[in-house]
Amino acid sequence: MVVREYNEEMKYIERLSPNSFLIKKGFQSNMNVEGIFYANSRLEKLMFDELRNACRPGMTGGFLPGVKQIANVAALPGIVGRSVGLPDIHSGYGFAIGNMAAFDMSDPTSIVSPGGVGFDINCGVRLLRTNLFEKDVQPVKEQLAQSLFDHIPVGVGSKGIIPMNAHDLEEALEMGMDWSLREGYVWAEDKEHCEEYGRMLNADPSKVSLRAKKRGLPQLGTLGAGNHYAEIQVVEEIYDKYAASKMGIEELGQICVMIHSGSRGFGHQVATDALVEMEKAMKRDKIETNDRQLACARINSPEGQNYLKAMSAAANFAWVNRSSMTFLTRQAFAKQFNTTPDDLDMHVIYDVSHNVAKMEEHMVNGRPKQLLVHRKGSTRAFPPHHPLIPVDYQLTGQPVLVGGSMGTCSFVLTGTETGMVETFGSTCHGAGRSLSRAKSRRNLDYKDVLRDLEEKGISIRVASPKLVQEEAPDSYKDVRDVVQTCHDVGISNKAIKLRPIAVIKG
């Protein structure tokens, strides 16, 4: 690994625009393409401070700085375009979280890397709208928060309440939301408003280890811990009236529910299993990477194909999981307001993944190419008229759901043509950490965090209060900076801002 002083490092980084920076070849060894990252003045300071700290003598351990990780990904075989760092980027395993990279499927050397998807495969966000307003919910907010907390199993070891045996799990892994529909947990229209219609067709449960299945079986329909949550939110601002109305959001004060969850221990095990296999494949195929954490396999190798099939099964698990929680959320609201979910107009606006690798067609040097697009902490953001987005959103572009940190605002964005060209149809996914979990535990007190939420008028139900400081707003970048940066560089447009009034957490 190249070790240089900070001033030397900065010679390889060039400002392209007020909010974008080019990472030139040579910043890390063997770069096949350049890197780029997007950041406004506040976010760029975090990026460069991280790099400066890493240049100090004796600084070892932990993950590499985000800029280095972007450059190491740029050195992977078969990468096309640029290795992209989005404004919410922070260091992660192999790839930074908030890193997008696309690989040419016609190139026999191209790879797939579990580190480019993440351990929580198809961690993603679903947004439901309602016909309720803040004035309807405010008087019963505490009861409603409790009702949600009672209905949705949360926390690290939480067990699901959706009846599930081993045979059901096999079917769910293969069918995704089609299983949820057959079993009566979702409405038929929910699938239409879901990335991939809630089902990755190349899923193959036989490529998933027994251990992963054992971990996943009791966890279906559970929220999990970490940064996962269910939030009752209020529409606070509408930036794009036309796009909002297409999503069924007509007025300020309207109530929505956001569910942020993934594939739980199941996806984690799939990733862990794949990394072991890929280390062997790298030796056999003589694949060299700059960082051991970037374990990978040729896309067309048995290990590469097995991982993609198992990853797709984990993605289906996550969609079934969010669908089960949608069912439980609808039940909780219906019970509280003594009516039906239908009468409350509890429709799914959209469901997006922000940890996945997918085969997509994109233009590269003016020609269409099949690419394997890795999005880790990055959301698909396809433009208007794209064939893969629902009929309802053909004129607006795909909705993009960006969850803020706990107690801060969330946003709905829409995809753009610029994003299609610049980032292969990708944008940010959230606020992005500015403090590691360990630092958050050392520097913040969970009681202060809970008090702060109460002062903001946010009801909170949390399974593990002592984990709360890891997710405190002070542990994260400001999601407003992240979303505005994406808007300013044109890779997504702001449509709606949502403010939380109740949070359910693991």
From Swiss-Prot:
Enzyme class: ligase
Ligand binding (GMP): 227-231, 354-355, 403-406, 410, 429-432, 505
Cofactor binding description: Binds 2 manganese ions per subunit.
Keywords: GTP-binding, Ligase, Manganese, Metal-binding, Nucleotide-binding, tRNA processing
Record-listed Mn(2+) 2 binding positions: 123, 260, 354
Positions annotated to bind Mn(2+) 1: 120, 123, 228
Active site: 429 (gmp-histidine intermediate)
One GO location term (cellular component): tRNA-splicing ligase complex
InterPro entries: RtcB, RtcB-like_sf, RtcB_euk
BP GO terms, sorted: tRNA splicing, via endonucleolytic cleavage and ligation
A Gene Ontology molecular function term of the record: RNA ligase (GTP) activity
Presence of keyword Manganese: yes
Pfam family, one: RtcB
Catalysis performed (reactions): a 3'-end 3'-phospho-ribonucleotide-RNA + a 5'-end dephospho-ribonucleoside-RNA + GTP = a ribonucleotidyl-ribonucleotide-RNA + GMP + diphosphate; a 3'-end 2',3'-cyclophospho-ribonucleotide-RNA + a 5'-end dephospho-ribonucleoside-RNA + GTP + H2O = a ribonucleotidyl-ribonucleotide-RNA + GMP + diphosphate + H(+)
Cofactor or coenzyme needed: Mn(2+)
E.C. numbers: 6.5.1.8
The protein's role, per its UniProt record: Catalytic subunit of the tRNA-splicing ligase complex that acts by directly joining spliced tRNA halves to mature-sized tRNAs by incorporating the precursor-derived splice junction phosphate into the mature tRNA as a canonical 3',5'-phosphodiester. May act as an RNA ligase with broad substrate specificity, and may function toward other RNAs.
Subunit structure, interactors included: Catalytic component of the tRNA-splicing ligase complex.
More details: Ligation probably proceeds through 3 nucleotidyl transfer steps, with 2',3'-cyclic phosphate termini being hydrolyzed to 3'-P termini in a step that precedes 3'-P activation with GMP. In the first nucleotidyl transfer step, RTCB reacts with GTP to form a covalent RTCB-histidine-GMP intermediate with release of PPi; in the second step, the GMP moiety is transferred to the RNA 3'-P; in the third step, the 5'-OH from the opposite RNA strand attacks the activated 3'-P to form a 3',5'-phosphodiester bond and release GMP.
Family: Belongs to the RtcB family.
Protein name (Swiss-Prot/TrEMBL): RNA-splicing ligase RtcB homolog
Organism (species): Anopheles gambiae (African malaria mosquito)
